[in-house]
Amino acid sequence: MKLSSILYVSVLAHLVMSKNVIDLDSFKESLHEEDHDKRDGKNVIDLEQFEASTQQEQNEKREAKNVYNLQSLKEDHIGENEKREAKNVYNLQSLKEGLDDENDKREGNVNKPEVSEEGSNKGDKRSMQNVIDIQEQDTHQNLLQSILPQLQSITIFTGYIRDDPELAMKTADSKQSMIIIAPSDDSISSKLNNLKPWEFPNELTGNSDDDRIVSENLKNFLNGHVIVDFKDKFVTSNDEIIANLVNGKQVKIKQEGSDKFKISTGDKWIKVETVKQVDNGYIFVINDVLVKP
């Protein structure tokens, strides 16, 4: 009885131990296979996604870069063309103006007008040249029409003269004698209470009459700065030249020293910044305006 019991227990123990060994080995193999499959699967998926993502990103960068460069190149090309075209237009215009000026100068040398030796019956009878002594370097053997565009400080006023047919014709007339008292560009911009010469004395209405009003206002402004037929109308008094502007207002001109002039239409004397003498008159540049709102 004891022997059979011992054998039974021994066999049972052996079976249990064998079963545990088998289960442990199977468990290890199962874990190893599962872990290997998981690692392999994870690595394959990540690698494919990474390659696909990287390739797509590189393609997008290349495509975007190409588009940007082409657009920039196109814009740069257009910009260069515009610069070249603008430069060509400017050069052609400058050449045309230069040729026109040269023609004007040659035409101005044909007939040099005589300067009156006497003034009016009023005041002293004196030579205009004795009263106005212009330095030789400021004397030009040409006409007002050709010298006006060369004075860069009065381009606005010169433009007004050019756009007035009657006055422009006089500046080109070698038999004319004129004095142009030209306001500088700065004075026209700063001394008219923020108005333009064509905006006063008559206000614009905003209708079809505006063209006429603009023309009349500019005419009024010009007539207040110009003396025509000067050599036949001036008088002298106390070393001053007195004459009437086209608008009828009296103006006085006096010289202080060899190159200093002043102009007055009332009690105030205005310094003359630049003086030029040509065959058919004088240009006096001032940093003020004689006609104000």
UniProtKB/Swiss-Prot annotation:
Top-level taxon of origin: Eukaryota
Q: Which subcellular locations apply to this protein? A: Vacuole
The segments labelled Disordered in the record are 76-126
What's one GO-annotated cellular component? vacuole
Name the InterPro entries on file.
FAS1_dom_sf, FAS1_domain, Mug57-like
UniProt-recorded name of the protein: FAS1 domain-containing protein DEHA2G15708g
Q: Does the keyword Protein biosynthesis apply?
A: no
- Give the Basic and acidic residues compositional bias ranges: 76-87
Please indicate if the UniProt record lists Methyltransferase as a keyword.
no
Provide an example Pfam family for this protein. Fasciclin
UniProt signal peptide: 1-18
Boundaries of each FAS1 domain copy? 141-290
**Stored Gene3D superfamilies:** FAS1 domain
- The membrane spanning regions, by residue number, are none
